[in-house]
């Protein structure tokens, strides 16, 4: 697929219920599917319901933005806002890193964008489409998400797991056509995991597993890929390799890739744009733009650390 779509947030508010219940839990029990259908429903056809991993979504043929307009994460019993009035843009062909301290709402924001949590005030647009009006199968062709949890498919081979990315296109029985198999092989090659295609998933390291899940998203052929802390639990070389891989995929395949991370310096060096969540607000810009505006210094907030705005490097004093 050659379509390109951007993400735009307009006046977005995310949060939790006042009683500490995560809104995704409330949403799963809700009968109001028009306010956000949990994409795990789509995964039931591909034996992935336990994973919480989205199937990719194939977007419409246009270059218009995905706009997320005036979203509020609310619960009938009330909600506590984590971050409000968020405005930001992620473009095709760019790697955007979402950074922020623990508890600022990074994962909540990603889950809201992916419609794993309900939206009540406002809408999410992909191109001209409000995602609340889309069927799960339509949504599963527009956006994919890789979460931190490891899928419990230990007896599958890598190729079989990647092939699940074709579920939105194969119908109920999940039979792969010759074209589906070609797309799966290409996705495996693009991520550089051809040598492990026949390995069992249970033998993979964390870094290898992340690459497999990225290949699965590529096989799903979505314009947008979301990743929640993909570099967590990886060693330093593994973090660099994975970030450079995502950067290359964004640039070469014109994907809109948005990921959350705590690895500030790696994000500064590899991201095209940053979304910085701080004090309930979202700051959007290139690494140099946010550095020049003083947001990176404020985010670090330590006298024992020196941040160089020109080189975007961090030094412990």
Language-model features: locations:
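ABC ATPase nucleotide-binding domains
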Residues: 300-317
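Helix-to-loop junction immediately C-terminal to a conserved catalytic motif
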Residues: 114
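H-loop/switch region of ABC-family ATPase nucleotide-binding domains
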Residues: 261-262
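The feature captures the beta-strand-to-loop junction immediately N-terminal to the Walker
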Residues: 99-101
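Conserved ABC transporter NBD signature motif
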Residues: 122-130, 139
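Catalytic Walker B motif of ABC-type/P-loop ATPase nucleotide-binding domains
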Residues: 225-228
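Conserved ABC ATPase signature
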Residues: 200-204
């Amino acid at each position: 697929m050659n379509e390109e779509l951007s993400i735009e947030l307009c006046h977005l508010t995310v949060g939790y219920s006042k009683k500490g219940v995560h809104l995704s839990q409330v949403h799963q029990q809700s009968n109001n599917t028009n306010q956000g259908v949990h994409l795990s429903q789509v995964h039931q056809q591909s034996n992935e319901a336990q994973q919480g991993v989205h199937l990719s979504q194939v977007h419409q043929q246009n270059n218009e933005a995905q706009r997320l307009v005036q979203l509020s994460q609310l619960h009938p019993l009330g909600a506590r806002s984590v971050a409000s009035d968020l405005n930001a843009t992620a473009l095709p062909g760019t790697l955007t890193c979402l950074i922020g301290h623990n508890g600022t709402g990074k994962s909540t924001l990603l889950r809201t964008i992916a419609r794993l949590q309900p939206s009540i005030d406002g809408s999410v647009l992909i191109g001209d489409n409000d995602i609340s009006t889309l069927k799960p199968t339509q949504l599963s062709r527009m956006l994919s998400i890789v979460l931190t949890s490891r899928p419990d498919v230990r007896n599958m081979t890598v190729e079989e797991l990647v092939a699940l990315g074709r579920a939105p296109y194969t119908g109920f029985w999940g039979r792969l056509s010759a074209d589906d198999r070609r797309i799966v092989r290409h996705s495996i090659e693009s991520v550089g995991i051809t040598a492990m295609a026949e390995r069992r998933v249970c033998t993979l390291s964390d870094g290898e597993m992340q690459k497999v899940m990225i290949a699965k998203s590529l096989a799903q052929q979505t314009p947008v890929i979301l990743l929640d802390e993909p570099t967590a639990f990886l060693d330093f070389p593994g973090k660099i390799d994975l970030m450079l891989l995502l950067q290359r995929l964004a640039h070469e395949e014109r994907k809109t890739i948005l990921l959350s991370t705590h690895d500030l310096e790696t994000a500064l060096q590899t991201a095209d744009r940053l979304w910085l969540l701080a004090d309930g607000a979202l700051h959007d810009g290139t690494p140099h733009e946010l550095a020049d505006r003083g947001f990176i210094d404020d985010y670090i907030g330590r006298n024992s650390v020196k941040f160089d705005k020109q080189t975007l490097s961090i030094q412990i004093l």
